UniProtKB/Swiss-Prot annotation:
Region described as Disordered: spans on this chain: 78-119, 141-167, 204-294, 341-364
N-acetylmethionine carried by residues: M1
Species of the source: Homo sapiens (Human)
CC per GO annotation: nucleus
Family membership: Belongs to the FAM53 family.
One GO BP: protein import into nucleus
Protein name: Protein FAM53C
Modification Phosphoserine, positions: S122, S162, S232, S234, S255, S273, S299
Ranges annotated as biased composition (Low complexity): 241-256
Amino acid composition bias (Polar residues), ranges on this chain: 83-93
PANTHER family, A to Z: PROTEIN FAM53A-LIKE ISOFORM X1, PROTEIN FAM53C
One Pfam family cited in the UniProt record for this chain: FAM53
Keywords from the named record: Acetylation, Phosphoprotein
Composition skew (Basic and acidic residues), residue ranges: 278-294
Length: 392
């Protein structure tokens, strides 16, 4: 049977509806006797068209059959009969489905959200289309909303009148002492910040329960809240929330105040991109440090360092210049080599000592050394004072 129908569809002419390929699914009914609609498997001649199908009394083309035209084929969907019909009328479907369309003809998916949207703490718009109330994962920071009845003493109940009237809002936990309502006018209380409201038509005011500290919705409404659909961490809309509405442009005053911020930092504005302050500074000017006061070194007197004191050689030269043939008795004492050797280190050591001493003491010791050298040259070396040499 399926082979005959497939061959018949392939031999149709081009002036009729285009039917390239069909996947025909004909579920066989349990009862072979279907008298109301006649034979469910009917053969149509080759010259006949799909539009000339015999009319079925139990189904109407406008009510029960849905024609969906596709560029590559034709689909016929026959709705199953209702449950009130006789058990003989089993639901059957005659579906003619074409091949899946090309991926190029499929609608282009929407572009991914921008980077700014990904960074913001917002809920996508698709959540508003969900039928069940959206609740996040259990956390310490979030608590779900409990809907109370009109008396307020009944147990929590969720309204089931209509899906668009469901209210789903989440907020941070408050202290247990938060037992004020935003509906009465004599109790001015601002709606809580960081509340995530997800409502389409919310006609109930907001109230804070003393047990959980979360904002709830009462059945008693003094004035209906305006319709809202908010997906940001901003104040919830209440009957008197018009004064709490943020401006169109975000400002430091409109942003919520963090409760854990220190007291000194609560009035500080929000951080903005500050202009570069390097232009105000002078470029190319180096900071000159004050020169460190260097300690004054003692000045060295090179004339005094070059002066030679009286020594044995000086005494010998002076006596030779005078031309005296008779040498004094102290010259004979200075002539032996061992004594002259002992005389020369005294002059060298005294000269080294005079160069290493400071300027203040140098002048005093210079005179002492000169006097001692004269006394050394004038007296006999037999009675040399070793203590005097060590001091010099």
């Amino acid at each position: 049977m399926i082979t005959l129908i497939t061959e018949q569809l392939q031999k149709q002419t081009l002036d009729e509806l285009k039917c390239t390929r069909f996947s025909i699914s004909l579920p066989l009914p349990d009862h072979a006797d279907i008298s109301n609609c006649g034979n469910s498997f009917q053969l149509v001649s080759e010259g006949a068209s799909w539009r000339g199908l015999p009319h079925c009394s139990c189904a109407e083309f406008q009510d029960s059959l849905n024609f969906s035209y596709h560029p590559s084929g034709l689909s016929l969907h026959l709705r199953p009969p209702s449950r009130g019909n006789s058990p003989k009328e089993q639901p059957f479907s005659q579906v003619l489905r074409p091949e899946p369309p090309d991926p190029e003809k499929l609608p282009v998916p929407p572009a991914p959200p921008s980077k700014r949207h990904c960074r913001s703490l917002s809920v996508p718009v698709d959540l508003s289309r969900w039928q069940p109330v959206w609740r996040p994962a259990p956390s310490k920071l979030w608590t779900p909303i409990k809907h109370r009845g009109s008396g307020g003493g009944g147990g929590p109940q969720v309204p089931h009148q209509s899906p668009p009237k469901r209210v789903s809002s989440l907020r941070f936990l408050q202290a247990p002492s938060a037992s004020s309502q935003c509906a009465p006018a004599h109790r001015p209380y601002s709606p809580p910040f960081f509340s995530l409201a997800l409502a389409q038509d919310s006609s109930r005011p907001c109230a804070a329960s003393p047990q959980s500290g979360s904002w709830e919705s009462d059945a008693e409404s003094l004035s209906p809240c305006p319709p809202q659909r908010r997906f940001s961490l901003s104040p919830s809309l209440g009957p008197q929330a018009s004064r709490f509405l943020p401006s169109a442009r975000s400002s430091p005053a409109s942003s919520p105040e963090l409760p854990w911020r220190p007291r000194g930092l609560r009035n500080l504005p929000r951080s903005r991109s500050q202009p570069c302050d390097l232009d105000a500074r002078k470029t190319g000017v180096k900071r000159r440090h004050e020169e460190d006061p260097r300690r004054l070194r003692p000045s060295l007197d090179f004339d005094k360092m070059n002066q030679k004191p009286y020594s044995g050689g000086l005494c010998l030269q002076e006596t030779a210049r005078e031309g005296s043939s008779i040498s004094p008795p102290w010259f004979m004492a200075c002539s032996p080599p061992p004594l002259s050797a002992s005389c020369s280190p005294t002059g060298g050591s005294s000269q080294v000592l005079s160069e290493s001493e400071e300027e203040e003491e140098g002048a005093v010791r210079w005179g002492r050394q000169a006097l001692s050298k004269r006394t050394l040259c004038q007296r006999d070396f037999g009675d040399l004072d070793l203590n005097l040499i060590e001091e010099n």
